[in-house]
UniProtKB/Swiss-Prot annotation:
Substrate binds at G70, G71, R92, N191. Keywords: Amino-acid biosynthesis, Arginine biosynthesis, ATP-binding, Cytoplasm, Kinase, Nucleotide-binding, Transferase. The keyword ATP-binding applies. This is Acetylglutamate kinase. It catalyses: N-acetyl-L-glutamate + ATP = N-acetyl-L-glutamyl 5-phosphate + ADP. Belongs to the acetylglutamate kinase family. ArgB subfamily. PANTHER family: N-ACETYLGLUTAMATE SYNTHASE (PTHR23342), N-ACETYLGLUTAMATE SYNTHASE, MITOCHONDRIAL (PTHR23342:SF0). One of its GO terms (cellular component) is cytoplasm. It holds the Pfam family AA_kinase. The gene is argB. The record marks K35, K252 as: Transition state stabilizer. The keyword Kinase applies.
């Protein structure tokens, strides 16, 4: 008998729930690190959907850890304050004055807003930075521009991770929301690329998955050819493709390669423009975006 139009939505919902069961069992008790950025961080509907996804994971016995950046928000605040901003080699040149703004925006605005959205579902989220409990130790980095090593100020890479700072929050059934600021060995605070920080944290926590939210459908092996979108790729193939990728995708792909090469079972580049993209990727057979696995 053909289901009636009224009965169909209920049947579809039941099918989706049944499809999610094996994935829920697989991920129960596991840590999933999510790099939060792009449109998912600026569109109100997507922000609320993402926050609901985090609460859903927590209530299913999965341990989400959110790492966020805030480039567009930092740029907007610098403009409002009349502070000049410059980029070299794809990185923001970070003077002490720019760093003060970055700290204010990352932890005081972007992180606070996400914590509040998640906590609308219950007392779950706790905002921290890489400065707290020595979560991250940074080492200053430079970039190469036209073959010349170039200083970009207070910009760092993650040198060490104190996983206990986050594991203690997970043990208390909290959702850590991490702003990517970190001191170096001398205590000088640096701004850290959020993609890099997410990969380092996933590795240190022994995460089951690393999810990278982007503003594209996934990884294209020959952009702008839409037919080149791949649903799964191994690290060897992806490493060969890396030099040919669009500049904006390279830090995300490097983060995926780092995490999977360090033992994280899979990393996922997913479309953050899709409502509840995290749930779609984790709990449906088709998923969304591109899965990176070990060779």
């Amino acid at each position: 008998m053909t289901p009636s139009t009224e009965a169909l939505p209920t049947a579809v919902k039941a099918q989706v729930l049944a499809e999610a069961l094996p994935w829920l069992k697989q991920l129960h008790g596991k840590i999933v690190v999510i790099k939060y950025g792009g449109n998912a961080m600026t569109d109100d509907t997507l922000r609320r959907a993402f926050a609901a996804d985090m609460a859903f994971l927590r209530n299913c016995g999965i341990h989400p850890v959110v790492v966020h950046g805030g480039g567009p928000q930092i740029t907007a605040m610098l403009r409002r304050l009349g502070i000049p901003g410059d980029f070299k080699g794809g990185f923001r040149v970070t003077t002490p004055e720019v760093l003060d703004v970055a700290r204010m925006v990352l932890f005081g605005q972007v992180g606070r807003e996400l914590v509040n959205l998640i906590n609308a579902h219950g007392p779950y989220a706790v905002g921290i930075t890489g400065e707290d409990a020595q979560l991250f130790t940074a080492v200053r980095r430079s970039v190469t521009v036209d073959g010349v090593t170039t200083d970009i100020g207070l910009v760092g890479d993650v040198e060490r991770v104190n996983a206990a700072a986050v594991l203690d929050l997970i043990a208390a059934r909290r959702i850590p929301v991490v702003s990517t600021l970190a001191p170096d060995a001398e205590g000088v605070v640096h701004n850290i690329n959020a993609d890099t920080a997410a990969a380092a944290l996933a590795e240190a926590l022994g995460a089951e998955k690393l999810l990278m939210l982007t503003d594209v459908e996934g990884l294209y092996t020959s952009w702008p050819n839409r037919d080149s979108l791949v649903s799964e790729i191994d690290t060897a193939t992806l490493s060969q493709l890396l030099p040919t990728l669009e500049a904006g995708m390279i830090p995300k792909v490097e983060a995926c390669l780092r995490a999977v090469s360090a033992g994280v079972p899979s990393a996922h580049v997913i479309d953050g423009r899709v409502e509840h993209c995290v749930l779609v990727e984790l709990f449906t057979d088709e998923g969304t975006g591109t899965k990176v696995v070990s060779s």
